[in-house]
């Protein structure tokens, strides 16, 4: 269903600032907290004493304390102490590889021995003072692949987002899709069009005229396990489009980290990074609020689509040219899942033979 030997965004640092956070990821119930020296830790959200969720407890001196009977858990899933009880021999619970990077907490739900922090996608905008970022989190009741489909085919903007970023020229512009290794790239360019409301506001935010024709671009990049980063923007027409000098354009990166909760639900970490007026905190908040409203327009569509697909599992869906980005992304996911299954089967055979 979803790759497990991969890094997913689990939460943001503020979510574990003062208490543990319980969150299901890839069908695994996990509790995140800050252990010794403030390092992020993640273990199974299950107390080995009576099965209570450890996320309902608290943290004391870097130890996770069960809120039911006070059992103390260490970062590696080992029981450390319990009031009035010797704990030697208590079974360990599963612990997870976690990393704090780029303003997010990342988790590896699979085999922690395979977890290499170097595999976390490099996010240039997150460590660069010339960029600003604002975002949020939505919980959506849909298969994570439906969200990938949605983001890799922005034709829907014309209809779902008609009052903000949609325009008829999106339908009319040709789409190009290519695959580079495990990365899928879908591109669309619209020349000499009028900017829709969201982008008129962005032009004004960058001190540019918003009532003149623009060249607009959308470059969607899928990377496994389920990340989609989209370069978007507008430039005054005839100034070079995507390659226009900064003084003629407003561009940004739409950030989409899609973390499966279950087979039919996701944690959707959304945001926008921009490299114009990065010190403008009010502009960052204005864009964040506007983008949040845009993404909220997708929620009902995706959730009702999921309900339809569950109700009619035998129905065959059409595949159109505009679906190429999503189709290719699913093929990448399928290859990774097949490789994980092959490795798991080989490991099982090896254990059986020993």
Swiss-Prot record:
Database matches in Gene3D superfamilies: Naphthalene 1,2-dioxygenase Alpha Subunit, Chain A, domain 1, Rieske [2Fe-2S] iron-sulphur domain
Q: To which pathway does this protein belong? A: Xenobiotic degradation; vanillyl-alcohol degradation
Q: Name one GO molecular function term.
A: 2 iron, 2 sulfur cluster binding
Keywords of the record, alphabetical order, are: 2Fe-2S, Aromatic hydrocarbons catabolism, Iron, Iron-sulfur, Lignin degradation, Metal-binding, Monooxygenase, NAD, Oxidoreductase
Catalysed transformations (reactions): vanillate + NADH + O2 + H(+) = 3,4-dihydroxybenzoate + formaldehyde + NAD(+) + H2O
Q: What is its EC number?
A: 1.14.13.82
Recorded hits in CDD domains, A to Z, give: RHO_alpha_C_DMO-like
* Limits of the Rieske domain: 7-107
Q: InterPro entries given for it?
A: Cholesterol_7-desaturase (IPR050584), Rieske_2Fe-2S (IPR017941), Rieske_2Fe-2S_sf (IPR036922), Ring-hydroxy_dOase_2Fe2S_BS (IPR015881), VanA_C_cat (IPR044043)
Enzymatic class: oxidoreductase
Positions binding [2Fe-2S] cluster in this chain are 47, 49, 66, 69
Question: Which terms does the UniProt entry file under GO BP?
Answer: lignin catabolic process
Q: How, per the record, is the cofactor bound?
A: Binds 1 [2Fe-2S] cluster. Binds 1 Fe cation.
Question: What cofactors are annotated for this protein?
Answer: [2Fe-2S] cluster; Fe cation
A Pfam family this chain is assigned to:
Rieske
- Which residues span the membrane? none
For this chain, the family text in UniProt reads: Belongs to the bacterial ring-hydroxylating dioxygenase alpha subunit family.
> Could you describe the subunit structure of this protein?
This demethylase system consists of two proteins: an oxygenase and an oxygenase reductase.
Protein name, as recorded:
Vanillate O-demethylase oxygenase subunit
């Amino acid at each position: 269903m979803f790759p497990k030997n991969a890094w997913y965004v689990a939460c943001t640092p503020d979510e574990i600032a003062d208490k543990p956070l319980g969150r299901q990821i890839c069908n695994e119930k996990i509790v995140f907290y800050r252990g010794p020296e403030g390092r992020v830790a993640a273990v199974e959200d299950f107390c080995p004493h009576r099965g209570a969720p450890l996320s309902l407890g608290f943290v004391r001196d870097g130890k996770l304390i069960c809120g039911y009977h006070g059992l103390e858990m260490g970062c590696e899933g080992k029981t450390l102490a319990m009031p009035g009880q010797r704990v030697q021999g208590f079974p360990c619970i599963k612990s997870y590889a976690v990393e704090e990077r780029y303003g997010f907490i990342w988790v590896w739900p699979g085999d922690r021995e395979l977890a290499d922090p170097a595999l976390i996608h490099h996010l240039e905008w997150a460590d660069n003072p010339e960029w600003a970022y604002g975002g949020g989190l939505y919980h959506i009741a849909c298969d994570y692949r439906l969200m990938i489909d949605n983001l890799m085919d922005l034709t829907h903007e014309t209809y779902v987002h008609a009052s903000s970023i949609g325009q008829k020229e999106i339908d009319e512009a040709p789409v190009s899709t290519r695959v580079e290794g495990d990365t899928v790239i879908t591109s669309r360019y619209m020349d000499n069009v009028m900017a829709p409301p969201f982008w008129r506001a962005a032009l004004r935010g960058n001190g540019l005229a918003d009532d003149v024709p623009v060249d607009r671009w959308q470059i969607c990049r899928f990377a496994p396990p389920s990340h989609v980063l989209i370069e978007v923007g507008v430039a005054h027409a005839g100034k070079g489009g995507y390659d226009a000098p900064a003084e003629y354009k407003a561009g940004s990166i739409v950030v989409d980290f899609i973390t499966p909760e279950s087979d039919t639900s996701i944690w959707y970490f959304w945001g926008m990074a921009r490299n114009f007026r990065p010190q403008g905190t009010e502009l960052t908040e204005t864009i964040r609020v506007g983008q949040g409203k845009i993404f909220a327009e997708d929620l009902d569509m995706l959730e009702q689509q999921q309900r339809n697909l569950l109700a009619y599992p035998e129905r065959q869906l059409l595949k159109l040219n505009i679906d190429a980005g999503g189709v290719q992304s699913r093929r990448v996911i399928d290859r990774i899942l097949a490789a994980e299954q092959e490795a798991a089967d080989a490991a099982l055979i090896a254990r059986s033979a020993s």
